[in-house]
UniProtKB/Swiss-Prot annotation:
Subcellular location per the Swiss-Prot or TrEMBL entry: Cytoplasm
CC per GO annotation: cytosol
Top EC group: hydrolase
Annotated spans, G1: 19-26
Protein's UniProt name: Elongation factor Tu
Molecular function GO labels: GTP binding; GTPase activity; translation elongation factor activity
Described purpose of this protein according to its UniProt entry: GTP hydrolase that promotes the GTP-dependent binding of aminoacyl-tRNA to the A-site of ribosomes during protein biosynthesis.
Taxonomic path: Bacteria, Bacillati, Bacillota, Bacilli, Bacillales
Amino acid sequence: MAKEKFDRSKSHANIGTIGHVDHGKTTLTAAITTVLHKKSGKGTAMAYDQIDGAPEERERGITISTAHVEYETDNRHYAHVDCPGHADYVKNMITGAAQMDGAILVVSAADGPMPQTREHILLSRNVGVPYIVVFLNKCDMVDDEELLELVEMEVRDLLSEYEFPGDDVPVIKGSALKALEGDAQYEEKIFELMAAVDEYIPTPERETDKPFMMPVEDVFSITGRGTVATGRVERGQVKVGDEVEIIGLQEENKKTTVTGVEMFRKLLDYAEAGDNIGALLRGVSREEIQRGQVLAQPGTITPHKKFKAEVYVLSKEEGGRHTPFFSNYRPQFYFRTTDVTGIIQLPEGVEMVMPGDNIEMTVELISTIAIEDGTRFSIREGGRTVGSGVVSSIIE
């Protein structure tokens, strides 16, 4: 069978289903693929079992089960993630294994918001999922219109509580199972949901359009030409003649100009996100730059020591710690290309963290690193990974 050509003319977004166990996330995922396929003949209609039997993947040593499906509307192409278990969501969202530009929060109209509904909204807030659209599922099981309105209000309040715009979030009422069974009235609700997703979740900015940043992996001197920093461009573009800042691991940021860009020993005019390059830097001595720093467009990212982070602590089975840790625990925090020691403070009322838990903690590093909300890191101890985290807010 010939492979279908990937249509680049459509914009692309990554989304996922979130919500409490058994509220219908996987059924909804199956319904979206099925209903859209039926209409356009594009994509693949997936059955519940095909999605539910997601294989385990290992992302940075963490075992996660995730189902990846794709489908398209008239306006956009979507990559959609759905996870079988609550723990898989926690790991997925914290490690960034599944980047989400937006999420569909599935809430059973028959049950209303439940503990994991709240936890997934909090996680979305902390790991930087920017937009949420709500699907009230199982509405065929609720005869009372007032009850539906009550559940909708509860969900909106919950979203507002975690700083999402609860009053403006689109809420679609439907039944994933009925849509999957081909009930026209409920198929229409799937189209309504996807129209809301198309409209409400903006097309993400491409990595190449963001401000330039490159983590420094290695540094060497070329006699007579100067100092070269090598690494993979994480975002944006850099051109010969651009001014950049060297950030992190030192008191002052240093500004310099890129006088040459090389890739595979060839000289380039510019490099962009994804390229592995060497950047020749004017007037920078070998001692003034080191692995673990970043090169960035001036003023776009700043060095910090203290931040809040959402962290998943690896279980013993995943090769993590066998024992809990407490406040003042001092492991290494691995940011991009280097380890920095940091001190952990647990939230008030939390005495210790067990392997397999997730928690929001405060971290203070011993030296500054270029970080921002959404920067991901690993926690390491003697070279092995014991946790995975994402910066949820900068303190100083």
